[in-house]
Regions:
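Amphipathic, coiled-coil-like alpha-helical segments
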Residues: 2, 18-27, 32-33, 58-73, ...
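Short, charged, low-complexity loops and linkers
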Residues: 6-17, 50-51
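Short helix-adjacent coil turns
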Residues: 13, 36-48, 62, 81-85
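Generic amphipathic, hydrophobic interface segment in small proteins and small subunits
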Residues: 30-51, 102-106
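Short linear capping/connector segments at secondary-structure termini
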Residues: 52, 72-75
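An anion-binding catalytic pocket shared by soluble metabolic enzymes
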Residues: 55
Length: 113
């Protein structure tokens, strides 16, 4: 599910920096979950789009490309006000799949020296 090649590249393989970026991702993922929940409950399309943009960017850095692709799609859809009936399923995809990605990253971070 996760490809850390990009993270390795941007950190130049520095383990301390890599750990720091992963830890930051954990915090951001939790914030993103909360933002999606609030935005969806309030039917705030602009906030859904902004949150999808952040989710896309953070998951791309971590190499969680399947989620990043869905978030990019959601972002584009909100920008163009297209098919709002699909927003909940894409948000649910993030909410349902990010815990497994986080767990996989926890395993990876534990392997680092």
């Amino acid at each position: 599910m996760i490809d850390l090649a990009y993270l390795d590249d941007i950190t130049d393989g520095d383990v301390a920096t890599k750990k720091q970026v992963i830890e930051l991702f954990f915090t951001q993922a939790d914030e993103i979950k909360q933002r999606f929940i609030v935005a969806e409950l309030s039917d705030n399309v602009d906030e859904i789009g902004r949150t999808a943009h952040i989710a896309k960017s953070t998951t791309r850095v971590m190499g969680i490309n399947d989620i990043a692709e869905k978030m990019e799609r959601l972002q584009r859809m909100t920008e163009n006000k297209e098919t709002p009936d699909e927003y909940p399923a894409l948000i649910k995809y993030y909410l349902d799949n990010i815990p497994a990605a986080i767990e996989e990253l926890r395993v990876e971070i534990a392997k680092l020296p």
